[in-house]
From Swiss-Prot:
Domain of life the protein comes from: Eukaryota
Annotated protein name in UniProt: Uncharacterized protein At1g21580
Bias type Low complexity, positions: 96-113
Native organism: Arabidopsis thaliana
Biased composition (Basic and acidic residues): 267-284, 325-340, 358-376, 421-436, 695-704, 1184-1204, 1361-1370
Record has Nuclease as a keyword: no
Stretches the record annotates as Disordered: 1-113, 151-194, 258-284, 299-376, 419-483, 688-724, 1063-1090, 1184-1211, 1319-1340, 1361-1429, 1658-1696
Biased composition range(s): Pro residues: 21-42
Keywords: Phosphoprotein
Chain positions with Phosphoserine modification: S378, S708
Biased composition regions of type Polar residues, renumbered to the chain: 52-61, 170-183, 1389-1398, 1658-1667, 1677-1696
Length: 1696
């Protein structure tokens, strides 16, 4: 079983590790010693038998090792050795040899138990891996490595239980060596990988966290123990010593640790570890030190040999401790190992020996069984706790056990609490698999309170061992708290171990500790000191102390919430932390699992803030963990961020799992993480609190009641207490659960609920405009604020959190007497309150650091607190999604605190800012959690009143006091009545959700608030306008209704003028005060005024230099949002120039350099990673094209007419992806990400052009999805009007055109000046202006493909539809396009001369004339026709690449004199001019008449190319030859093709002479011709295979343009390109442009594809040897990615 376990572990680990390991693998190649380890391994096989992995896994392990060796190139030579190598990696083989007897003993002694362990582990790991496999390759690497390491310990622990001393020693040793050299290497590789992923947007963290979490869970207990012990012993301590975060990192901040390792490399890691070892018992450490030195220096072989020589090492005692924790080893060895490890860990000698391992042993065994049960479905569960420094494990009722297992066991299994968070995430993912289990988990975990008591006991015990390790350990322990994670519990649990509430606090403390582990060093001492108290968390989170007692519970809830949120940010820096927290949360949360507690949003907020802040780093905390927070924002916000990031990943998993209660709980945790930072120094997260609360409604209530006031009192701890927020959250959840149980009963149980799970929030994606206040400076600086907003944004839509705290606090103060103030403080950390959209989704986004109102009854109350968008009722919340914006500049932002609470005001006011300022001032720490919660916190949290009240009552009182700084909090229940500074909330009115929260001078952007109109849903979005530096999150434009409202509101063109006055909302609907405030702020925008026309979209126009805006609308996915935020932050930082935001579509316009993804990013969970990528891309693009991007927007005013499309027009450099990234879950993350990456490339290449394009793409996707689905239909017109007002055809076109918009360089400008742009300009809303679209004159992007594939609706501009070849943005947007492009890349590109307007979609039948064929494309349908699989590209492509009205497609009469020349076994179509494709010279486009299905009857499958696909290809500028089916189409099929290709409006009429059909080329062809790219996916059967010949759009475009006019005759069309299919069939693709143009004599040669397909490059003329312009290259990259997908099914899978 272990083998299986390990195999999965290794698999993920190796996979990611392998690339990195390969280099290390060279050093590692000292597998020659590994062959010696094989003997130990073989002798150890007994131990593997003990493990149940050696024998059982000899083959598996070998296989795994094969994988591993593949990954680890040095290992491949030894398969047998591989097995030893695996052991070696896992455990120093010398150790194994050393302990062969022990191993045998253990094996003999406990052979069957270990298999159980193994069984458990594999399941656990495999499940987590499955759930987190995404990240498996990235983060999991190191996670896997850690797992392996721990697993090695675990394995040794299992087998080494007999050989207690040796086993642990060996394990430890091996683990270390593995960790040091293997892991370090792996970390060098893996760590690098992790860093890469980290930079990638935390993809690894998100996925990897999931996977890591799972792995940690899987080996969690082992690893919990092992790692805890390792950390405590040598590994943990040395890790801690090397970097404070590491012990914690090991679990939650594993990344940080790994990072250090990667930095230190083997040596550094070894040194660190050795150092740690020195810290830990010397004998083992020394042994390890020398061993590791040898191991590292000589390579693993030597180390193995040495270890083999010295199997005597009693590291196994450590392992025993680990085994105890992991409950793998047998009692004896466990005792020895446990006591020994524990002693080592504590450095206390054998303090815990007898009891520790006795309890541990029992615990370990039971726990393992339990874990197995959970994963392996083994019913055994243990109650493990430390009493008097003794770890006691008691069998617990299996249900509890299951719960523990699931939550604690899995999480604790990977004792890294952060890893636990990962586990949590994995669990979420896995939970999906085991939802029933999850329910059990909830129950069990609730019963785990017992476990918490245990944990408390453990805490006492662990406390001793935990000092260096305490944070990390407690985190792990907490996860395992119920599990038997002694370590984590150590720090905090003690106080609140027993009572449920306490267990909540315990969890909270654990979580806090996790957080602390993030700030490990800082908290380390504190934790040890305060192990008993939440205080110890204070180090990390001021809240801890406050949270003690009830607060602790609250904190636990917060933790839970935090964890829940983890998903959103998990990928980010917070990943590990969140993992840890999540794990704890899982254990604790599950314990506290009270479906009623839905403060899931809270976590989102926290999550988001964490994410956005990269909470990873507390001020003290090491920021290694995720790249985000290296500055280590001080303030709890940091903590939150950490939690958030991890949280985010977890949330992602959670979202996937969507297991009922647990999901919700995790969000709690997230929230708690995010709030708890009040003081930079006290970063202990209060997240535990929320987590704790989460479990019980009553507990929550209690906590709320007691906590809220405490919060106020705690306030002193500036936000020390997240409790209030968490309480409120809990209350909200509670109420929500109770009240909304029917409505949001789901919520409690539902995936959707999991606020933490962005996936579910995706459901509410419309609402989900997260607001993240993010100060771009701050963000880059690791500002809590920035991150928080980002985090919030990314965290699913709960953006309430960040701003929530302040506003919430003030709101709470206003609404609830209770000191929501704390909330306010937290607000800063939980800048955004994400109104959870969708009812069930985390409704309670409220949490802003404790900002729930005291109203317990109102779940929403908590939400109200500040952005606590606590959708008290999820559903209500959903609409309510108000953007909470916290101002970036704490000082600047007077807390608009809706709450009339003086405190809230105070906090909100600059004064709070000041307090915040201290941290904020440096911007490095904008710790939201200042006592005042600082303006940022206050930003708006304006108390969202209770559930119902929330909308009403709170209405976002966020009035930002804007420049005036007067607190405009108008808390009125109707948020409608604008906040005083209406400006903050343009109009709080629900419809206006657009509240701009910008404060002019102050720059406080408090907008937020959704008001009660939440119900109206119309203004889901509360958009905050940020003035100079502050950034305002976009309001999420949720529904059509909102759209209309926004329409009206959108009137709110927030005109930013340089004048200091804040944004001026031109919104007609905006209340006067808004108007006034707006005026105040309107000047705020440094660069000209920006109008928000977009109705629904809540784009924030950022003005000032650095602020970033994240569209609030970002998909509910947390991750994505978080990524976006991070990107924004990065962009902001990099391009500090003023960036005008174009409000359009939820896109945030970043000031100059920064870019923001549209808020609209699709909510679909799948998008989360892609979004992140997008954002990163945006960031890159911004940086690269800072100037370029200035898009007319920078100096002048930029209006976004696109309603849904949230394109951000950055002022100069920033680029924003459209908010409209498709909601659809169909778009796979990868696709989106790829698209985004493509966008990145494109952006870089055509910075401005692409940048717009990317936005357009995103817009298109989202708009397509959102607008088409909801906006387009009802709100479409509204949006349209609003958005497109200048253009005249707004949304209808928008949806279609969205993608087109971004495509050209001009498009950026177009976005900015969509109205004015002529010719190719595409309006921001994605409709191409076509030739000059005067105010929407003539060119109506007529085709709006309903949010389905065509974002690219081609618009026939004026007379002809011109599709400007967009780089690939739309392609990017459309996964299909992407994949297509990738495929095309693989195939020779037919350069297509684009003389046809690229806007023509590939709709042959639908579009016969130049008018944009409005072919009905199913957005998610890859295949236009069921028979034509090739049209899989159709789905997401916004084909309407900017219609260049400039070029008209000359009508081409294709003569269908199709002569086939037989070459080889296939007929090749003679490139006759009659050939449609040839005549056009755009074989791909001609052939790729996606819409008109080109059927190759001869092949029996239709070659269908989606018009959409073609359009997007055109847009992409790449024409992929449509791969005809294996047999060249017969004349009949050709005629079909020609028919299909009928030139739209006769522009490029291709007629086959045979058919003499002068059918207008389908616009798709036209487009492809215009764009110079045609995708010719030919479906071999259902597979949509693109010829993969990418026509270089740019070049082809030019060629076509040149050629088409003259050469678009049948002769040109005649030219066909044949692609050899897998089936050994040649597909004829007619090159539209290759024939006529003699520029490049088309080579009829075939290019051999990787798939053994010949692609004929008939279009080479124009292609110029397939030289691709940058666009084409970008497209190629996308195409390569696409082409990698072998079949349309793949496309559809990813794209649908």
């Amino acid at each position: 079983m272990d083998s299986s376990h390990y195999n999965p572990t290794y698999d993920p680990w190796n996979s990611p590790y392998s690339p990195h390991l390969h280099p290390p693998s060279a050093p590692l190649p000292p597998p020659p010693p590994l062959p010696p380890p094989p003997p130990p391994r073989q002798s150890h096989p007994e131990s593997p038998n003990l493990y149940g992995r050696s024998t059982q896994s000899n083959g598996q392990r070998q296989d795994y090792l094969h994988q591993y060796s593949h990954h680890r190139q040095d290992l491949p030579p030894n398969t047998v050795v591989n097995q030893p190598t695996s052991n070696y990696y896992q455990h120093p083989p010398p150790l194994q040899q050393q302990h062969q007897p022990l191993s045998l003993q253990q094996q003999q002694q406990h052979p069957q138990y270990i298999p159980q362990q193994v069984s458990y582990e594999p399941q656990r790991i495999s499940q987590p891996l499955t759930s987190s496999i995404q990240c498996t390759e990235s983060q999991s690497d190191w996670v896997g490595f850690n797992e392996k390491r721990l697993d090695s310990w675990t394995v040794d622990s299992g087998p080494g239980r007999s050989r207690v001393d040796d086993g642990p020693s060996r394990n430890y040793q091996y683990d270390y060596s593995r960790n040091s050299s293997g892991v370090n290497r792996g970390l060098d590789g893996s760590s690098r990988s992790r860093d890469e992923f980290r930079s990638l947007g935390y993809a690894r963290k998100e996925s990897g966290v999931t996977r890591t979490e799972g792995n940690y869970q899987a080996r969690g207990q082992l690893k919990s123990e092992s790692d805890r012990y390792v950390r405590g012993l040598g590994d943990g301590n040395r890790v801690l010593s090397s970097s404070v975060g590491y012990g914690s990192d090991r679990y939650g901040l594993t990344v940080s640790r790994d990072v250090t390792r990667s930095s230190a490399s083997r040596e550094g890691a070894r040194e660190t570890r050795n150092e740690g070892r020195t810290l830990y018992p010397e004998k083992k450490d020394d042994y390890y030190h020398s061993e590791i030195e040898q191991y590292f220096d000589r390579g693993r072989r030597e180390a193995s040999n040495e270890l083999n020589r010295t199997p005597r090492k009693q590291v196994q005692k450590k392992s025993a401790l680990l085994r105890l924790e992991t409950p793998r080893s047998y009692k004896n060895s466990r005792e020895n190992e446990w006591s020994r490890q524990h002693n080592h860990h504590n450095g206390n000698g054998k303090r815990f020996n007898s009891n520790s391992y006795r309890g541990k042993e029992h615990l370990g065994h039971s726990d393992r069984g339990l874990v197995e049960k959970q994963r392996g479905r083994s019913p055994v569960d243990l109650d493990i706790s430390f009493k008097s420094n003794v770890l006691v494990a008691k069998p617990v009722a299996s249900p509890t056990s299951a719960g523990i297992r699931s939550g604690a066991s899995v999480t604790p299994r990977s004792i890294k609490a952060r890893r636990a968070l990962l586990s949590d995430k994995n669990e979420k993912v896995s939970v999906t698999e085991r939802n029933g289990k999850l329910g059990t988990h909830l129950s069990d975990e609730i019963s785990v309170s017992e476990g918490f008591r245990r944990s408390t006991r453990q805490t006492t015990a662990s406390k001793n061992e935990k000092e260096p390790d305490s944070h990390s350990t407690p985190s792990s322990s907490d996860s395992g708290g119920k599990l038997n994670k002694v370590r984590f519990v150590n720090g905090v649990v003690q106080d609140s171990k027993v009572k449920l509430t306490d267990s909540g606090p315990e969890a909270s403390t654990h979580d806090t500790e996790k957080i602390s582990s993030f700030c490990e060093t800082l908290i380390e001492a504190k934790d040890d000191i305060n192990v008993k108290h939440g205080i110890n968390t204070e180090a990390c989170s001021t809240e801890e102390g406050v949270i003690d007692g009830n607060q602790s519970t609250l904190k636990s809830h917060e933790d839970v919430l935090d964890r829940t949120s983890t998903d959103c940010n998990a990928g980010e820096a917070l990943l590990p932390k969140v993992m840890e927290m999540d794990e704890i949360l899982k254990t604790k949360t599950t314990i506290n699992t009270s479906p009623g507690k839905l403060p899931v949003s809270w976590p989102t907020v926290a999550d988001l803030s964490g994410c956005s802040e990269d909470m990873d780093c507390d001020e003290d905390m090491d920021c290694d963990e995720d790249m985000d927070c290296i500055p280590s924002r001080n303030i709890p916000m940091m903590e939150v961020n950490t939690g958030f990031e991890e949280r985010k990943s977890i949330n992602s998993s959670d979202g996937s799992l969507g297991y009922g209660g647990k999901d919700f709980q995790k969000p709690y945790l997230d929230a708690s993480i995010y709030f708890n930072r009040e003081d930079p120094g006290d970063k202990v997260l209060a997240k535990s609190d929320i987590g704790g609360i989460e479990d019980d409604n009553k507990r929550i209530d209690k906590n709320v009641d007691s906590l809220s006031p405490e919060n106020d009192s705690s306030r002193g701890r500036p936000m020390g207490l997240d409790s209030p927020a968490s309480l409120d959250i809990a209350n909200v959840s509670l109420d929500l659960a109770n009240s909304n149980n029917s409505a949001s009963g789901d919520l409690a149980n539902a995936n959707s609920f999991t606020v933490g799970t962005y996936m579910n929030p995706m459901v509410t994606s419309p609402d989900k405009s997260v607001v993240f206040q993010m100060e771009s400076k701050n963000l880059p600086h690791c500002k809590n604020t920035v991150n928080a907003p980002v985090e919030n944004v990314s965290g699913k839509g709960y953006m309430e959190t960040t701003p929530l705290n302040v506003a919430a606090e003030t709101a709470d103060n206003m609404d609830s007497e209770e000191g929501k103030q704390t909330c306010v403080n937290d607000t800063s950390s939980s800048l955004t309150k994400v109104g959870v959209k969708g009812s069930s989704n985390v409704l309670s986004v409220e949490r802003t650091g404790g900002c729930s109102h005291s109203d317990e009854s109102d779940l929403a109350m908590a939400v109200p607190s500040e952005g606590c968008m606590e959708n008290v009722s999820t559903e209500r919340l959903v609409p309510d999604e108000e953007l909470i914006l916290k101002s970036y500049h704490p000082a600047e932002i007077p807390c608009v605190d809706s709450g009339s609470d003086s405190r809230g005001l105070k906090t909100c006011l600059l004064e709070p800012n000041v307090s915040l300022s201290k941290d904020l001032t440096d911007c490095a720490r904008e710790s939201l959690v200042e006592q005042d919660v600082s303006q940022r916190s206050a930003i708006f949290c304006d108390k969202l009143p209770s559930l119902s009240a929330f909308v009403t009552e709170t209405t976002l009182a966020i009035g930002i006091n804007g420049m005036s700084g007067n607190e405009t909090v108008t808390d009125t229940e109707s948020g409608l009545h604008e906040i005083q500074p209406c400006t903050t909330v343009c109009k709080l009115s629900p419809e206006d959700r657009f509240g701009y929260g910008s404060s002019g001078a102050i720059g406080s952007v408090r907008s937020l608030s959704i008001d009660k109109n939440l119900e109206k849903d119309s203004s889901k979005v509360s958009s905050c306008l940020v003035s100079d530096n502050s950034v305002s999150p976009c309001h999420i434009s949720p529904l059509v209704a909102v759209n209309e409202e926004i329409q009206n509101k959108i009137s709110v063109k927030a005109n930013y003028s340089n004048s200091q006055d804040g944004i001026k909302h031109k919104e007609d609907n905006c209340t006067e005060s808004v108007e006034v405030e707006t005026h105040e702020e309107k000047a705020k925008l440094p660069g000209g005024t920006s109008k928000y026309r977009t109705p629904v979209t809540n784009i924030t126009a950022g003005s000032g230099g650095d602020s970033l805006f994240l569209c609030d609308s970002l998909s509910s996915s947390r991750r994505r949002i978080r990524s976006e935020v991070h990107v924004s932050a990065v962009v902001d930082e990099t391009s500090k120039g003023e960036e005008k935001s174009k409000p359009s579509g939820g896109i945030v316009a970043v000031r100059r350099d920064s870019v923001f993804p549209c808020d609209s990013l699709s909510s679909s969970p799948r998008l989360s990673r892609p979004l992140r990528s997008e954002i990163h891309v945006a960031s890159m693009v911004d940086e690269t094209s800072k100037s370029i991007e200035k898009i007319e927007s920078s100096g002048g005013t930029s209006e976004h007419r696109t309603p849904e499309t949230d394109i951000v027009a950055g002022s100069r450099d920033s680029v924003f992806p459209c908010n409209s990234l498709s909601n659809s879950q169909r778009l796979s993350f990868r696709q989106l990400r790829s698209e985004i990456h493509v966008a990145n490339m494109v952006d870089e290449t055509n910075r401005v052009k692409e940048s717009q394009n990317g936005d357009s793409l995103l817009d298109t996707l989202q708009e397509q999805i959102m607008t088409s689905h909801e906006l387009t239909q009802p709100g479409s017109s509204a949006h349209c009007d609003l958005v497109m007002k200048p253009m005249g055809d707004p949304i209808a076109k928008l949806t279609d055109i969205t993608s087109d918009v971004g495509s050209q360089e001009k498009d950026l400008r177009n976005i900015a000046k969509t109205d004015t742009f002529d010719g190719e300009a595409v309006s921001s809303d994605g409709q191409v202006s076509g030739t000059e679209i005067p105010g929407g004159s003539g060119v109506r992007v007529s085709r709006s493909y309903s949010h389905a594939d065509v974002k690219f609706a081609l618009t026939h501009v004026k007379e002809h539809v011109v599709s400007v070849p967009h780089r690939d943005p739309q392609s990017k947007t459309s996964m299909n396009s992407k994949y297509e492009i990738e495929k095309r890349k693989k195939k020779p590109n037919y350069s297509t001369q684009k003389s046809y307007p690229s806007s023509l979609p590939y709709v042959s039948d639908t579009k016969k004339d130049a008018n944009p064929p409005i072919h009905i494309t199913k957005r998610h349908t890859w295949h236009r026709k069921s028979d034509a699989s090739p049209s899989s590209f159709v789905a997401a492509k916004p084909l309407s690449s900017t219609l260049s009205t400039q070029q008209k497609f000359p009508k081409v009469t294709a003569q269908s004199n199709n002569s086939y020349v037989r070459k080889g076994n296939s007929l090749l179509r003679k490139p006759s001019h009659g050939s449609p494709g040839a005549a056009l010279g755009i074989p791909p486009s001609a052939i790729q008449l996606n819409h008109f299905t080109v059927e190759d009857k001869s092949t029996g499958s239709s070659n269908m190319v989606d018009v959409d696909n073609a359009s997007s290809l055109v847009k992409t500028g790449e024409i992929a030859t449509l791969e005809r089916q294996s047999k060249p189409p017969s004349d009949s099929s050709t005629s079909k093709l020609s028919n299909a290709i009928a030139t739209s409006s006769g522009k490029c009429a291709l007629s086959y002479s045979t058919d003499h059909l002068t059918t207008g080329l389908p616009e798709s062809i036209m487009d492809s011709a215009t764009s110079g790219e045609a995708n010719f996916p030919h479906s071999g059967g259902d597979t949509l295979k693109t010829s993969d010949t990418l026509i270089q759009t740019g070049y082809a475009s030019d060629c076509q343009q040149k050629r088409n006019p003259s050469d678009l005759d049948s002769s040109n069309l005649k030219r066909m390109v044949y692609v050899k299919r897998k089936a050994n069939q040649l597909v004829a693709a007619s090159d539209i442009h290759d024939v006529s143009q003699n520029q490049i004599p088309s080579s009829d040669g075939y290019f051999k594809r990787s798939k053994n397909q010949l692609v004929r490059n008939s279009e080479s003329r124009c292609n110029q040897s397939i030289s691709l312009p940058d666009d084409a290259l970008d497209t190629r990259s996308a195409a390569n990615m696409v082409s990698e997908r072998p079949s349309s099914s793949a496309f559809s899978d990813s794209g649908m």
